[in-house]
């Protein structure tokens, strides 16, 4: 309780355990964090768990053309959350499905995760699964406002997408 009160007065840098706030969030807390290493993901999940009362649902992926050996480790660390939604995160020139397969190889409890390759759909799915009192952690991109796919830089901001999906789920506002 003391920790929760203290953290309520602290503001994190953009994209670091940044709370996504909308007028009607259905009692679901959504946070965006840049956590893109196994240690950072584990710490972000632990931080959410320390202040939350409900379940923690994490949405995450791993970047393409980067250290492939960390992917199964990220998968294993994600299971510190109550549930995980594995998705795409800057696949660059790699096949997003192959990246996801590498991640899932480290996840030994199939009942506690699912794969949703489209990042927007993955964020929407996590919010859909959440109940009042739960927290959703969208990890990996943090402050970034783009998605790298092949040679394309596509506009994509986890914070904006999460706010849109919260509004759609609980506020009746449709998104495109």
Task: Tell me the role of every PLM-derived stretch.
Residues 1, 5-176:
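ATP-dependent carboxylate-amine ligase
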